[in-house]
């Protein structure tokens, strides 16, 4: 699913998982503007894309929260841009709060069991 972060054609991305709270951003083909929450799962071939390029794009496009799930390192760096909180490291044993919601948590220990 394409996400056009701004007017530049260079900022069309395809996040692994995204949450869009404003349905007006959807036009039937893509999301026009920043999603509220994005999770990218690191692919072994190009981790810099998620750790550097997309981090830069998402922060500047006003994505509220961005997680990077790294199955190889078994880490989840959390970036809560809305509060200028960057790169808080969690491990797969943790239950992590989705900061943009009051009562939403993701239990990575359960995901870790599925990966092993």
Feature map (PLM): residue ranges:
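C-terminal interaction segment
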Residues: 1-61, 68-116
């Amino acid at each position: 699913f394409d996400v056009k972060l701004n007017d530049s054609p260079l900022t069309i991305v395809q996040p692994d998982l995204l949450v869009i709270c404003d349905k007006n951003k959807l036009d039937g083909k893509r999301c026009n503007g920043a999603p509220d929450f994005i999770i990218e799962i690191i692919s072994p071939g190009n981790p810099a894309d998620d750790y550097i390029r997309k981090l830069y794009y998402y922060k500047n496009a006003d994505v509220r929260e961005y997680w990077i799930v790294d199955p190889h390192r078994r880490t989840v760096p959390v970036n809560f841009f809305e509060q200028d909180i960057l790169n808080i490291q969690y491990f797969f044993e943790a239950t992590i709060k989705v900061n943009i919601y009051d009562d939403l948590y993701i239990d990575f220990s359960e995901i870790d069991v599925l990966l092993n």
